[in-house]
Amino acid sequence: MLLGHAKYEGILQSTPAITVLHGEARFMNENCLTVQLAEGGERTVAFDRCLIATGASPALPPIPGLKGTPYWTSTEALASDAIPSRLAVIGSSVVAVELAQAFARLGSQVTILARSTLLFREDPAVAEAVTAAFRAEGIEVLEHVQASRVAHAEEEFILTTDRGELRADKLLIATGRAPNTRTLNLEAAGIEVNPQGAILVSHTMRTSAPHIYAAGDCTDQPQFVYVAAAAGTRAAINMTGGDATLDLTAMPAVVFTDPQVATVGYSEAQARHDGVETDSRTLTLDNVPRALANFDTRGFIKLVAEAGTGRLIGVQAVAPEAGELIQTAALAIRNRMTVQELADQLFPYLTMVEGLKLAAQTFSKDVKQLSCCAG
């Protein structure tokens, strides 16, 4: 809170040209909105340009009995001053897996109910590796399981599933985040949204109303703080006469579990969906010297190349330091490098990022037969 005040609220309040209104805004038309002020009353605001950056909130699945129970979202979980003996987690998203493992390591007996698999939008090998790691440390992962009813009695949650009842002291709902757009009356301003209510934006952050821009988790862009920051910067530039764009084709993403998950670019399935033929290789971490030195060879590095050209178009990694290597992969993709060009680069020995070079070498060599740092 102190950091937020110093970096944001304090700056806004100390800038004479900025007026801060606390309340709920609603569009009247494409050039005017009203604000129901928190202290009472209403104020009309006319504008030439508008930026919508209302963020997102935890989504609530329509499970009978859930409303009215003291369930947790990520907000309550992170604010808790006690560790539950038994924690049930509904969801398989990034937030679900990060918090599930955190509470397990703090001492909770954790059970995850995944409608599909963990991190189901990623390459299936990612889900398999994370699930195996979780189960190895005692986290129960129930795949293809949904709760059909939730009850709370005598300080205990009872979840009804097709595999029987599950009881827990606390229940964490982590099934994604919904954009905060429902009350904005966007249709009055001619602003289009997708079926989930996310505002559709172009690569310049413009909405379907040319003078209205949007950035962050309220849009149809990936919900990451660095994407929101980049989008907001570009929106501000364009709202003041500039011409800035945001290219997300090589956007890295990291899941902070242990081992970490890091991805950038295409997975095989995504490439196939877009009609791109691929050639892929997977290097297990027992072939990476740094992983051997760490005595932790859980995971892999997978490179996805465009068939025929060998151009690198995607990387998926599961490793204890996967997040530290993914930006190198992003730069390689951004610069349209082939896997052979990546394999020919010099990487420092005994670093995890060296695994990218080794993975690239597997397209033309058997790395098991190479010396420790063969070029």
What do the PLM-derived regions correspond to, one by one?
Residues 256-267, 272-375:
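Flexible, glycine-rich terminal cap/loop adjacent to redox cofactors
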Residues 6, 19-22, 26-38, 106-203, ...:
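A Rossmann-like FAD-binding core segment of flavoenzymes
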Residues 17-19, 57-59, 192-193, 242-252, ...:
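A short alpha-helix-loop-beta-strand transition element characteristic
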Residues 28-30, 34-70:
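Glycine/serine-rich phosphate-binding loop and adjoining beta1-alpha1 elements at the start
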Residues 52-113, 137-141, 187-189, 193-204, ...:
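Glycine-rich dinucleotide-binding loop and its adjacent helix/turn
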Residues 1-9, 79, 84-88, 94-156, ...:
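Rossmann-like dinucleotide-binding cores of NAD(P)H-dependent redox enzymes
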Residues 67-83, 165-239, 324:
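FAD-site-proximal beta/loop scaffold in flavoenzymes
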